[in-house]
Design a protein with these regions (language model features):
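Active-site gating loops and adjacent loop-to-helix segments of metal-dependent hydrolytic enzymes
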Residues: 69-100, 140-143, 208-253, 327-337
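Histidine-centered catalytic micro-motifs
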Residues: 56-68, 199-208
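Active-site beta-loop-alpha junctions enriched in small/polar residues
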Residues: 64, 123-124, 144-148, 176-178, ...
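His/Asp/Glu-enriched, well-ordered alpha-helical/loop segment
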Residues: 248-251, 294-377, 389
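N-terminal metal-binding scaffold of metallo-dependent hydrolase/deaminase domains
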Residues: 1-41, 52, 357, 382, ...
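Histidine/acidic residue-rich metal-binding segments in metalloenzymes
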Residues: 130-133, 155-278, 290-305, 359
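C-terminal cap of metal-dependent C-N hydrolases
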Residues: 8, 369-407
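Alpha-helical scaffold segments that flank or form the walls of functional sites
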Residues: 53, 71-137, 158-166
Length: 407
């Protein structure tokens, strides 16, 4: 029997909305949207969400669930290198229970804020894996590599993941950054991803110190952070911006999701327009780490922009509604007409594009996966209603056709 999900408003792929309609689901696939008068109890199992807005599930395109536990242990810091120094030290003193509990708490916060897909960064060779699989959340699983873990590309766990990708679990490779990998090692990671046909991601242009490092200027990464590494990374490049450097060594024009991108030159913007790299912005994290916001005027109009919370190591929450509301308040100055519509697109279809999953999720369309959420109406405008929502307003959450929450 087909499922029919009714709601007062349904957000459509063109960011308009339908009324008096229902989304039809066959197993885990969206079959289409039909008017309510066509529904019959004999053919459809009807779920009536009444006075609510139904939309695609949110996609948190960049998060570190495994680092939840670090939030309580961080000391005040004045710069990005000071913060990174602490994170490196803390990560060396982990235990399995800390990681497991962190991931479970992070998953609860994510699901309760309407997230149905995450772009999880995993740096502990799979300690977050079981909890993620058990939760049922759709996952783009970015396996993180740095100089210190470069041998992990030969690990049994990673080789197993390459064989076990499915519709709910999609493996990707994540070289941590240009400053945590030798040029030779970064090229090796790119080649590995090319061989196995996997998408990549990387933290890029996140701090002024990273920019200065790539430009071979004085920076506090070399002064304060590299002493934590076993050896200083070998950066074999002429002075360049991080994006110029990465683009130059990306010889096979692989898809690389660029995370943060809040310190960009005019040349960087030209490269983005030309190459169309997917980008994930994490604006609250940038402010938390004493950095400037991304160029919202550019990214609000860039078609492959996704939104991420980052982790609790660099944010005050991973509640995705908090991230959406923050972006909304800052975007109102840039997009005069209906910024809330574009923000919801970034939080859904934009995230799917950033993770390379837009053929299957991110919008309510025929033949896409049934990843849906609904919120109680708080405003006569369905878009503003979502902007004004909190976790308590989440009425329904569905992942892959299975209801996770219904009130």
């Amino acid at each position: 029997m087909f499922q029919a999900i009714k709601a007062k408003y349904i957000i459509t792929p063109d960011q308009s909305f339908l009324t008096n309609s229902a989304v039809i689901i066959n197993n885990n696939i969206i079959s289409g949207i039909i008017p309510n008068y066509q529904l019959t109890r004999k053919k459809y199992k009807v779920i009536d969400l009444k006075n609510s807005v139904l939309l695609p599930g949110f996609i948190n395109s960049h998060v570190h669930l495994e680092l939840h536990w670090t939030q309580k242990l961080l000391n005040p810091f004045n710069s990005f290198p000071d913060w990174l120094n602490q994170i490196i030290s803390l990560k060396k003193n982990f235990d399995n229970s800390k990681i497991s509990n962190s991931v479970k708490k992070g998953l609860d916060e994510s699901l309760n804020s309407g997230v149905t897909t995450i772009g999880e960064i995993s740096s502990y060779d799979g300690l977050d894996y079981k909890a993620i699989i058990k939760s049922g959340i759709r996952t783009a699983y970015f396996y993180e590599i740095a100089n210190s873990t470069i041998l992990n590309i030969e690990s049994k766990f990673l080789k197993g993941l390459l064989q076990n990708t499915n519709s709910l679990f999609n493996l990707k490779i994540f070289p941590h950054s240009i400053y945590s990998l030798d040029t030779k090692s970064l090229k090796k990671v790119l080649a590995f991803a090319k061989k196995h046909n996997t998408q990549l991601g990387i933290h890029l242009s996140e701090s002024v110190d990273e920019i200065n490092y790539a430009m071979k200027k004085k920076n506090n990464l070399e002064d304060k952070v590299f002493s934590k590494f076993n050896s200083k990374p070998k950066f074999d490049s002429r002075p360049s911006t991080p994006l110029e450097y990465l683009d130059r060594i990306n010889l096979f024009r692989q898809i690389i999701t660029l995370v943060h991108m809040n310190n960009l030159s005019s040349e960087d913007l030209k490269i983005l327009k030309k190459r169309q790299y997917p980008v994930v912005i994490c604006p609250r994290s940038n402010l938390y780490l004493n950095q400037k916001l991304p160029n919202l005027r550019f990214f609000m109009n860039y078609k492959k922009t996704g939104l991420g919370t980052d982790g609790l190591s660099s944010n005050i929450s991973i509640n995705f509604l908090d991230e959406i509301n923050f972006l909304y308040l800052n975007a109102k100055k840039i997009l005069i007409n209906n910024p809330e519509r574009r923000i919801l697109e970034i939080a859904t279809l934009g995230g799917a594009k950033a993770l390379g999953l837009d053929n299957s999720i991110g919008s309510i369309e025929k033949n896409k996966k049934a990843d849906l959420i609904a919120f109680d109406l708080k405003n006569k405008d369905p878009y503003l209603s979502v902007m004004h929502s909190n976790s308590g307003d989440l009425k329904m959450s569905m992942i892959d056709g299975k209801i996770i929450k219904l009130k």
